[in-house]
């Protein structure tokens, strides 16, 4: 994942992630879908706040603002986010459609939350450590700034 974590193929053909931060979970139903998501998302941990998935409008807004921010950042560096991502997707023979990014994010969420969950336990008995799940209850400050909402507003929309 670029930071010491590992993606793993699970028995059912889905893809799991064991992150370097100790988060573990299923992240996609297939390698192609994972790559399509990552071409847009770049980083799975940017999409691990479970509250964004409780409201269709909230996840659509988050994804649109996320892509808008990526486009602005790339433009400042002198290149096109869309062209670079389209080229990358073409090299990997996968689809690239930023307009369907919210649907890809929702597929990630459904994979991450479907039973049975992919988990890891290290050790046994009282000394066992069970890793945190891939989805989080934390509403990060940068995500609040990105969507222009407070944590309270996001939580209210998630109900």
Residue ranges of each PLM-predicted region?
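A C-terminal-region feature
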Residues: 1-159
């Amino acid at each position: 994942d670029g930071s010491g974590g590992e993606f793993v193929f699970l028995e059912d053909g889905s893809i799991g992630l064991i992150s370097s931060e100790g988060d573990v979970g299923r992240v996609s139903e297939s390698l192609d879908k994972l790559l399509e998501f990552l071409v847009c998302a770049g980083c799975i941990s940017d999409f691990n706040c479970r509250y964004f998935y409780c409201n269709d409008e909230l996840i659509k807004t988050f994804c649109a603002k996320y892509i808008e921010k990526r486009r602005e950042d790339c433009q400042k560096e002198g290149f096109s986010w869309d062209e670079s991502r389209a080229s990358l997707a073409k090299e990997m023979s996968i689809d690239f459609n930023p307009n369907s990014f919210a649907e890809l994010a929702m597929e990630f969420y459904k994979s991450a939350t479907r039973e049975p969950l992919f988990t890891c336990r290290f050790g046994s008995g009282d000394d066992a450590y069970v890793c945190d799940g891939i989805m989080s209850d934390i509403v990060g400050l940068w995500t609040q700034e990105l969507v222009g909402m407070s944590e309270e507003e996001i939580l209210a929309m998630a109900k």
